[in-house]
């Protein structure tokens, strides 16, 4: 049995360590008080929101994590840029913002033209899918600090104030809709790598694909689907299911969720069969659901019809009055 903390990623320890940084960061809000770009303290969750009159500028930052180690191990770099862009633009969507632009940060041990070209191809494809411009970035060559490379980015989006989605409108009875993920996306890779690679090797064949192909499958970009949803349906909440798995739903509301998740398939089944506890699976991985939308019950069918034109989507369940997340078909509560 292996947990995320045992694999080296202790979320509780990280949260405790971050408290001082978060406290000081919030203290800087006063430096923009009464000025253009004043932070909207009570609104941002997946992305911070800054006041620009009739609209908010949304901003978020994220990286690819240890997925880059798999790319390095097999020498395939042309999808990792898609992952980085996906991690950022999908977060912007969760406050109702349309992603607009991104700057990247690439830290390397030494420059390599082939690696850079592959990363650039992925960044271009990710930008194309998201409909954004890459307007700048930083490349840091640090042989004394970096072994390999790290890729991260910061993205901005815009949203009219009246269209901001915060989760405050969520009420018991609302429908919870899941949009299918492409696989593991960019979270839980440390656990997956340490559990599977030593035992099987990256070329291990599982259900018609090599292990490295399962691990490197690009994170799905939901921009077109979600923007169309927002335009046509009343959306009460949006959650990008990333680090923390289904616990991300708690970021939206104090109400609870009663849901049924899809069957455990693909890479998730392989991980589960190798000893990760069921509750830990739902706390770490997206488990086949990359994005969740919460909509009024009466708009559920229209939302499903619209989303299924882009990606396979399905009703997961409903919002309930009791706090917590109940995964009914697996008998667990988070």
Swiss-Prot record:
Q: Which reaction does it catalyse?
A: 2-formamido-N(1)-(5-O-phospho-beta-D-ribosyl)acetamidine + ATP = 5-amino-1-(5-phospho-beta-D-ribosyl)imidazole + ADP + phosphate + H(+)
Q: What is its EC number?
A: 6.3.3.1
- Molecular functions (GO terms): ATP binding; phosphoribosylamine-glycine ligase activity; phosphoribosylformylglycinamidine cyclo-ligase activity
Q: Does the keyword Repressor apply?
A: no
State where it is primarily located. Answer: cytoplasm
Keywords for this protein: ATP-binding, Cytoplasm, Ligase, Nucleotide-binding, Purine biosynthesis
Could you tell me the superkingdom of the organism this chain comes from? Archaea
Q: Can you cite an annotated GO cellular component?
A: cytosol
Q: In which pathway does it act?
A: Purine metabolism; IMP biosynthesis via de novo pathway; 5-amino-1-(5-phospho-D-ribosyl)imidazole from N(2)-formyl-N(1)-(5-phospho-D-ribosyl)glycinamide: step 2/2
Pfam families named among the record's database cross-references: AIRS, AIRS_C
- List locations, semicolon-separated: Cytoplasm
Enzyme class at the top of the EC tree: ligase
BP terms from Gene Ontology: 'de novo' IMP biosynthetic process; adenine biosynthetic process; purine nucleotide biosynthetic process
User: What HAMAP family does this protein's entry cite?
Assistant: AIRS (MF_00741)
Belongs to which family?
Belongs to the AIR synthase family.
* UniProt-recorded name of the protein: Phosphoribosylformylglycinamidine cyclo-ligase
User: What is the species listed in this Swiss-Prot or TrEMBL entry?
Assistant: Thermococcus kodakarensis (strain ATCC BAA-918 / JCM 12380 / KOD1) (Pyrococcus kodakaraensis (strain KOD1))
Q: Which gene encodes it?
A: purM
